[in-house]
């Protein structure tokens, strides 16, 4: 067996854990639930959708996105199959609402499914979480049409701000930024105190990567 140590594409386990539990199921009442979702995977990006079937995607099932890492959205966003799922990258967070009261009594199970993501090595769809629908209860809660107040931000950057572009590429198994490998002795950007700069990150590496800056 030959292992190519220059061909790494992250670590993909064959079982997805939710809150540390494999093959998780959750008993729910037939009402609205608000969930906070964090992608804690080291390498995997998800596209989440609700389905009435464990193996195939059913049509017309939905979830409503109400918040992101930055807090409440201005308005809720409803995602229904098969048109759209919730794409969630590594370390991203979302808050969603699923209305289990919308399903008739003969529907006993729902599944939170990963539709697969092209950049993942194993992009096959799979069920992540099973909801067991139980008793129907009164629920007068509503999802407001207006959520958080989002104040538009004006132009804070002066016209003479310095612009930098950082291109992330992978050639021959080696990661490069602007065609340079990492060197702890080299400084690629050294803004002065009070300077304004606009940085553009371009990912051409072939898959999603959570690029972030260390100061």
Where are these regions (language model features)?
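Histidine- and aromatic-rich segments of cupredoxin/plastocyanin-like copper-binding domains
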Residues: 1-154
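C-terminal substrate/ligand-recognition segments
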Residues: 152-158, 162-215
